[in-house]
């Protein structure tokens, strides 16, 4: 028997190496390894289409090989955000799929957001089981970069569809998702694919204190997701009397790849999607790329206009200036690990969650 610590450590190391060798023989090379043999690389991401949200996520976008949940009230921009992710993936040459469980995808609107619908794989499954089987085939193919499921609430179990209208089916959907996610999690990681679940909000009955809101599909999705995004409409954008868009806020309520509880605010314009020009103005002013004096904005000692909407009009007609400002903003974010902007609301949310 070894008498000193060094000999005991040597024996333990030999035993560990022997165990690793046996595991590799049983399950194949790469089934187990030390981290120094496979050093951690920078997380590969796909942009959300929003500079502010990419910054709030801390890694420059949605991480590949992970499961993502986007949830919020009706007409808050959930599908719009998911379509922007698809458009960004396609710009990089990626393949994408849209599982339209709600049977409500607006193809014309998707095109306006920059989605190449000719290259988009679309499925409209009849049951929740069929939807998850289709997702499993797509993920295991290794050929798809982004898969969007719209929505969790529409993943109706076969037993519920085949039953009578008034039948009670307690927990069927939650069990379906729990079983499906157990199978999909490792496959998504191996395929380096992003699997996005769009989810709806429901109200808990009888909640007096605390938040009565909850998401559909049980608790399994909350555990298996690496990133959860809470998207809300916080205001409207008007052009004189007409409403032309929504002011939108996204909270990163869960993040396994960077610090959570950050926020991003941006505009979603009708028939246009996320307003990149609005983000350029807001983030440019925050980062000091644009100079703001009262309601006036300036860039390189050149006055761009008075008021945010007038500056957006100027940048729309002067795309070279807009591209130059955007490049400077992204360079600043990249040099600070994409995570230098946390507004006061995010700091307060972080403090509440910690303390």
UniProtKB/Swiss-Prot annotation:
One example GO MF annotation: damaged DNA binding
Ranges annotated as spanning the membrane: none
Record InterPro entries: AAA+_ATPase, DNA_recomb/repair_RecA, DNA_recomb/repair_RecA_CS, P-loop_NTPase, RecA-like_C, RecA-like_N, RecA_ATP-bd, RecA_C_sf
The keyword Zinc is assigned to this record: no
GO BP term, example: SOS response
Subcellular location: Cytoplasm
The UniProt record lists the keyword DNA damage: yes
Main location per the UniProt record: cytoplasm
GO terms for cellular component: cytosol
Entries under SMART domains matching the protein: AAA (SM00382)
Binding site for ATP: 72-79
SUPFAM superfamilies linked: P-loop containing nucleoside triphosphate hydrolases, RecA protein, C-terminal domain
Keywords: ATP-binding, Cytoplasm, DNA damage, DNA recombination, DNA repair, DNA-binding, Nucleotide-binding, SOS response
PANTHER family xrefs: MITOCHONDRIAL DNA REPAIR PROTEIN RECA HOMOLOG-RELATED, RECA
Family assignment from sequence similarity: Belongs to the RecA family.
Entry function: Can catalyze the hydrolysis of ATP in the presence of single-stranded DNA, the ATP-dependent uptake of single-stranded DNA by duplex DNA, and the ATP-dependent hybridization of homologous single-stranded DNAs. It interacts with LexA causing its activation and leading to its autocatalytic cleavage.
Protein name per UniProt: Protein RecA
Species: Wolbachia pipientis wMel
Organism lineage string: Bacteria, Pseudomonadati, Pseudomonadota, Alphaproteobacteria, Rickettsiales
